[in-house]
Design a protein with these regions (language model features):
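Conserved catalytic core of sirtuin-type NAD+-dependent deacylases
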Residues: 1-284
Length: 287
């Protein structure tokens, strides 16, 4: 019979980092975890920023531009038609699996994500707050009716069959780099109920996070012993605000992130490692 080797032990660096995270919390207290794009790059979803925190590509469309211009919506949905399959086919990675396991072990008070891919829930995490919504849903900006993004994808393909065979580089959040094309004839479906504008049910740049989500995160933070940021540069205020609030409450803030972060001076600990590897080490060492 062939022997099955046990999984390798984490390196001393990963082991020490996992222990350092545990040591920051008072006995019996748990982390509120705030995740960003670095948790999902291992699942094949591109991120927005480089290690210096700078944009890798032009900034995403704003809510004002999307709502104010039919041409902008044509360009958005044409690119999304090609980029959506990457999101639809993405599966949870090492970071998602580790955080779900740590939550089951009682290490995590709650999980908040700035990502819109739904992979934390797919990995088995409970009660995830999707701060910026989910790309798998679409909502009418007129009557509020919702539909699944997969349903809209079928509508887009039916109306624009010539676009299906185009190739494009995947971009963050179901976008695709598709330049040099004439989008003026791209047929964008309207809401089947009221004829209104359909928009992904995610928070665009220039759009506020719904207040009930912010309050839900604050309630979790009140109960948590500290805030752990995983895979986020904190360049967006919607996540950064909770770092400031944790510090104001006298709670430690730690981060697992590769690259420059905003407000690093507020961190009690920063681990410049892949968040999936640190999560795996934490599971292995039962810290």
């Amino acid at each position: 019979m062939t022997a099955i080797a046990p999984p390798p032990s984490p390196s001393p660096v990963l082991h020490d980092a996992a222990l350092a995270l545990r040591a920051l919390l008072p006995p019996g207290r748990r982390w509120l975890v705030l995740t960003g794009a670095g948790c999902s790059t291992g699942s094949g979803i591109p991120d927005y920023r480089d290690l210096e925190g700078q944009w890798k590509r032009p900034q995403p469309v704003t809510l004002q531009a999307f709502m104010g211009s039919h041409a902008t919506r044509q360009r958005y949905w044409a690119r999304s038609l090609l980029g959506w399959p990457v999101m639809a086919q993405a599966r949870p990675g090492q970071a998602h699996a580790a955080l779900a396991q740590l939550q089951q072990r009682g290490w995590i008070e709650g999980l908040v994500t700035q990502n819109v891919d739904g992979l934390h829930t797919a990995a088995g995490s409970d009660g995830v707050i999707d701060l910026h919504g989910r790309i798998a849903a679409v909502r009418c900006m007129g009557c509020g009716a919702g539909m699944e993004r997969a349903v809209l994808q079928a509508m887009l393909l039916e109306r624009n069959p010539g676009w299906a065979g185009l190739s494009a580089q995947a971009a963050p959040d179901g976008d695709a780099d598709l330049e040099g094309r004439d989008f003026s004839r791209f047929d964008v479906p309207a809401c089947p109920h009221c004829g209104g504008v359909l928009k992904p049910d995610v928070v665009f740049y220039g759009e506020g996070v719904p207040s009930q989500r912010v309050q839900a995160v604050r309630a979790m933070l009140q109960q948590a012993g500290g805030l752990l940021v995983a895979g986020s540069s904190l360049m967006v205020y919607s996540g950064l605000r909770f770092v400031h609030e944790a510090v104001a409450q006298g709670k430690p803030v730690a981060a697992i992130n590769q690259g420059r972060m905003r407000s690093e001076d507020l961190l009690a600990l920063k681990i410049e490692q892949d968040c999936g590897q640190i999560g795996r080490a934490s599971c292995r060492e039962r810290v």
